[in-house]
Design a protein with these regions (language model features):
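Signature of short aromatic-glycine-proline-rich micro-motifs recurring in repeat-based ectodomains
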Residues: 116-129
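Conserved beta-strand position repeated across blades of beta-propeller domains
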Residues: 17, 72-74, 123
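Hydrophobic beta-strand positions that form the internal "hydrophobic ladder"
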Residues: 25, 80, 131-132
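Segments that shape or occlude catalytic/ligand-binding pockets
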Residues: 102
Length: 196
């Protein structure tokens, strides 16, 4: 059987998930306005889709430049479930692909999480109306399930970055000096000026 490479660029494309009809793949990608390969700056992971027949990739704007990972199609192919930390905690959200309506599926004190920042932590069971997700609580990771039946409350999307300032947790500071963390915080350190 033939292997076909669908994305052929510098972007980090992760966590592919097939649509029920097999025509589209949703995935997570660092495509976005904040990605600049010359300055080595990268957008937070966003949702994206690729049309398998044409190779056309499009990003799906949801909450701005925050984490959007682990996309999973609903049974009808008209909704996409994903994990985002748009308010400082990673929770599961549902995006209607028809009208762009966004609903919160979970609202957990500790958030939905895998073992690492980008680890998949949620799965939609085809034909069952159930999702499973992992939560770190009581000093352990646990798997929970939730029924997806019924209406979910729509959430307000904050468009203006200044209005989001109070919605995120403050950044953590390293306990001790880290040269690597210092370099990573300033992507232009050690690079030649752009006009050379």
């Amino acid at each position: 059987s033939e292997t076909i490479q669908l994305t052929q660029d510098k972007y980090a494309d992760l966590q592919p998930s097939w649509s029920p009809d097999g025509r589209t793949i949703a995935f997570t990608s660092d495509r976005g306005a904040a990605t600049n390969f010359e300055l080595l700056t990268y957008n937070s992971f966003q949702l994206a889709m690729i049309e398998v027949a044409t190779g056309e990739v499009r990003t799906i704007p949801v909450f701005g430049n925050v984490k959007h990972i682990n996309p999973q199609f609903g049974d009808d192919g008209e909704s996409l479930y994903f994990i985002s930390d748009q308010d400082g905690f990673s929770d599961v959200y549902k995006l209607s692909l028809e009208d762009g309506r966004i609903s919160r599926v979970t609202n957990l004190a500790t958030g939905v999480s895998g073992h690492t920042y980008l680890a998949p932590a949620m799965s939609v069971a085809p034909g069952s109306g159930l999702i499973a997700y992992t939560v770190f609580d009581e000093l352990e990771f646990h798997v929970y399930t939730k029924e997806l039946d019924g209406e979910l409350p729509e959430i307000l999307v904050v468009e203006n970055a200044e209005d989001q300032l109070g919605r995120k947790l403050p950044p953590t500071m390293p306990d001790r000096f880290s040269r690597i963390a210092t370099y990573l915080a300033d992507a232009e350190t050690g690079l030649l000026p752009s006009n050379t």
